[in-house]
Structure formats: C-alpha cells, structure tokens
C-alpha cells in the first residue's frame, strides 16, 4: 500500500523552512546534497509532532510550528532544533537501516502511529529507537555548534518541555534528551565554544 502523509501548501512559510534547513544542511555531512532534500509542511493530527524524517532526504515539518516560527523568535529556535534533529536522522541513515523503510515496520510501543501523522490506520510505522533519537539530537547539536548557535537555547527548549510537564513519548523521552543536551553543552562551554 502506498501512503502519503498529507501536506499543506504555504509559500511564505515553506520559504522560511527551506532557508532554515539550508543553513543546517550546509554544515552537515550532506552539504553537497541540499538539492536532494524535500521538505514538506503537514498539519499533523497529533499536535506534539513537530517534524519527522522518512528517508531519502524527505522531511515533514509541522505547519503550525513553522507558522509560529515566522512570527516569534522562540518558535524559530524550536523550528531550528526540529530541523537539525530531522536532518541528523537523514545523515545517519536511520530510516533505511535494517533494509526496512520507515513505513513498513510495526511500532513496538506507544510511539507515533499512522493516524497521528494523518495516514490510514492500516499503515504501520516504524519509530526510531531512543538511541537513534538521542544520536539525532547529538548530531543536531553538532550542526548548531558549526553554525555558531548557542547550545543553551537547545537546552532551554527541553527545559521548557519539562516545565510544561511534557515528558515526550517512549521514543523521545524529554528527561534523557535534556540530560544529554546539558552534557554536550557543558563540554562546549569547557572547550570555549560558548
């Protein structure tokens, strides 16, 4: 069964997202493959889904997040965090590991379901493991460092999730993500990066 995640067309917001993604891709392992990236906007039924990568350099970003990012700098940083995380999934090849595409393995727990992203219930999704999610955060923070972006902003975003009692889901545990980000940021401080 071929399934497509529903997308939204919004030229002004798409331009913002593409420009932000281009900065990140330019400092990534894919710096010579910018034109291969396809970035789509989607109104995910589950509002806490900010973005996702599905392989072959295809990334979906929450339309709501992108609209807010065009108006408020705090959301712009959240968009940048989301893009860096999703680009990192792509550069790490997470969607294609084990010879299985993102759409053809069952979720093994309460992660993101097909319905959460606007697909029929008959479509099964494969969530990335916690280790792969943490790897994407780590690589994403590396892109931020290369761009000269302050890692403390990444940490504050996760602290904001924690203050709102948003624990994430089984594959995106806020506490583990925050602990890792603090450690990476502390190393950057010690190395004189920030």
Give, region by region, the residue ranges found by the protein language model:
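A Zn2+-metalloprotease active-site environment signal
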Residues: 1-194
